[in-house]
Amino acid sequence: MRTTFNRLRAVKDSLPHGSMDAIAAELGISGEEVRAFFNGEGTADYHLEPGFDGGIVDLTNTRILEVALRRAWEEQNAL
């Protein structure tokens, strides 16, 4: 999947407080790994190329992003 770095930052900014650790717990990974994902600190599944809107990000594993998008949607649509 390809997206932009600024789009990833927008997803991060839309998450409620404490989401990094909640995402990590759900996926069975460390909170630091989730933070690194959104801060552009390279992981094996994350490749950043120079380009518009902060650069082009090529994700080979989208599970962190998928959980983050779901949590952001749930927060936005909470009653």
Predicted regions and their residues:
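Short, amphipathic alpha-helical "recognition" segments used to contact nucleic acids or chromatin
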Residues: 1-17
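Short alpha-helical "recognition helix" segments of helix-turn-helix
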Residues: 22-24
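Recognition helix of helix-turn-helix/homeodomain-like DNA-binding domains
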Residues: 31-52
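Short Lys/Arg-enriched helix C-cap and helix-to-coil transition segments
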Residues: 45-79
